[in-house]
Structure formats: structure tokens, C-alpha cells
């Protein structure tokens, strides 16, 4: 995969040289480039200007963005504008991006963008319902979430499949050695070696955690009959069963 990032602060992306993204680069699975679009700005390298019609703040000018993208060698890239008004970033969207060969991220600053910049992009994406100083942190988050899904990046191909959100549910609790730590013990079912009981326990715990912490995820979840029965059991135990 090839990723190009348009930013005023390329140095902010140093963390991507480490951990999973760094390993993907070492394996030759990822080629990532940073472009300071101030280098392509006309008018004394100014990248922002006042909005027509008045208003507070400054807008990112179209010219530096257009010129930067036009010099990037890409066949048919997915061009992503990081914008608080965009669609929410999700695990499903990261899985979609992981199938692409070329991605371009545009990191904004200031009050917003000249609307004409949006004629370049294929996607307008938001990290969440909050505003950041710039798009760099959002871009790093999206790159990390996407790159780890590229085949052969993680040690085991199934590693990411059990992650929270990959199945549509939050991940079940997990434990490692020792069995007893300060009086807190590992659930006996995990010590039983009984694979079916362990599977059911994990599924029930995933449903429980999702129901208690992120019930919104269940509104669009496609339940199996087994999962529906387990959820009813959970609700009944919590005294929230249907009348």
C-alpha cells in the first residue's frame, strides 16, 4: 500500500515509524510519504486566507492543496479529507481502506477549507464528534487502524479478527499468568480446556460488555439465534428483561 499525507507538520508523524506501521514499512508492505503543502503555496508561502463574506478564522486555500496532489504520482488514489463534518471513522471503514492500493490524506488547519478543495476528494471523514487543532492526529489514528489490517502486517492473520468492533461486538475479557493475582483469579471456564464452553463464555461476555457500554452497536447488529438467546439471558440477569 502507498500512503501520501498532506500536512503542515510532517514532523508530527514520527510515531508512525515505530510499532505496527513501522514494521509494515520494514516488510515492504507499506510506502508512506509526507508532503508539506506550504512548499507548494504561492503568495509568500501563505496557505490560508480570509473567507469571502466575512466570518471568524482563516480558511485553507485551494491552490496549495491542488498543486500538491497534482505532483503526487498515483493512479487512482482514495483521497480522504479529514473534516469534523465528515462521516464517522469506523472499523468497517478501516477494513475498506485496507483493500486499497493508494491512499491520500489531507490534514487541515485553521477554521476550515475552501469548499473547492472538496472537488478533489473521494471521502470526507471525521474521527469523532469533537474538534482537533489539526488533522494530523486523526490521520495517524486512521493510518494505524488501516495498516494493521493489511495481510501479513500482523503476526497472525487472525489477530485482528477478534479485536473489538471487528465482529460488531466489543471484545471479551482476557487473562494471562498468573492464575491468582492479589486474590483476583482467572474464570474457571478459561482453565477448563473445554473449547465449546470457552467459546460460549467469550460470546456471552462480548454481548454483555457491548450491551452495557455500547448499546448503540447492538441496534445495527445482525444477531444469530444463539446470540439473541444469550442477550435475553443477560438482560434477565440484570433485571432488564422484556415484560
Swiss-Prot record:
S-adenosyl-L-methionine binds at residues 108, 127-132. InterPro entries: Alpha/beta_knot_MTases, tRNA_m1G_MeTrfase_C_sf, tRNA_m1G_MeTrfase_TrmD, tRNA_m1G_MTases_N, tRNA_MeTrfase_TRMD/TRM10. One of its GO terms (molecular function) is tRNA (guanine(37)-N1)-methyltransferase activity. GO terms for cellular component: cytosol. Its EC number is 2.1.1.228. The keyword Zinc does not apply. GO terms for biological process: tRNA N1-guanine methylation. It catalyses: guanosine(37) in tRNA + S-adenosyl-L-methionine = N(1)-methylguanosine(37) in tRNA + S-adenosyl-L-homocysteine + H(+). It comes from the Bacteria. Signal peptide: none annotated. It is found in: Cytoplasm. Keywords: Cytoplasm, Methyltransferase, S-adenosyl-L-methionine, Transferase, tRNA processing. It is an enzyme of class 2 (transferase). Belongs to the RNA methyltransferase TrmD family. Specifically methylates guanosine-37 in various tRNAs. Homodimer. NCBIfam families: PRK00026.1 (NF000648), trmD (TIGR00088). This is tRNA (guanine-N(1)-)-methyltransferase. It comes from Streptococcus pyogenes serotype M3 (strain ATCC BAA-595 / MGAS315).
Amino acid at each position: 500500500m502507498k500512503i501520501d499525507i498532506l500536512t503542515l507538520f510532517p514532523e508530527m508523524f514520527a510515531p508512525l515509524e515505530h510499532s505496527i506501521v513501522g514494521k509494515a514499512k520494514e516488510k515492504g508492505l507499506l510506502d508512506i510519504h509526507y508532503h508539506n503543502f506550504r512548499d507548494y503555496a504561492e503568495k509568500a508561502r501563505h496557505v490560508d486566507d480570509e473567507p469571502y463574506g466575512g466570518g471568524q478564522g482563516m480558511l485553507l486555500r485551494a491552490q496549495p492543496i491542488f498543486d500538491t496532489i497534482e505532483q503526487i504520482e498515483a493512479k487512482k488514489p482514495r483521497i480522504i479529507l479529514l473534516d469534523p463534518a465528515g462521516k464517522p471513522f469506523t472499523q468497517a471503514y478501516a477494513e475498506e481502506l485496507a483493500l486499497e492500493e493508494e491512499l491520500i490524506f489531507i490534514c487541515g488547519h485553521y477554521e476550515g477549507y475552501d469548499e473547492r478543495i472538496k472537488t478533489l476528494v473521494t471521502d470526507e471523514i471525521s474521527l469523532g464528534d469533537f474538534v482537533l487543532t489539526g488533522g494530523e492526529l486523526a490521520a495517524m489514528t486512521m493510518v494505524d487502524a488501516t495498516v494493521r489490517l493489511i495481510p501479513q502486517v500482523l503476526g497472525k492473520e487472525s489477530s485482528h479478527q477478534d479485536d473489538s468492533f471487528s465482529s460488531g461486538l466489543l471484545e471479551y475479557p482476557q487473562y494471562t499468568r498468573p492464575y491468582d493475582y492479589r486474590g483476583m483469579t482467572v474464570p474457571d471456564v478459561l482453565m477448563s480446556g473445554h473449547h465449546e464452553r470457552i467459546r460460549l463464555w467469550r460470546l456471552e461476555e462480548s454481548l454483555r460488555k457491548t450491551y452495557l457500554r455500547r448499546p448503540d452497536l447492538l441496534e445495527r447488529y445482525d444477531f444469530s439465534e444463539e446470540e439473541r438467546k444469550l442477550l435475553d439471558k443477560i438482560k434477565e440477569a440484570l433485571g432488564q428483561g422484556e415484560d
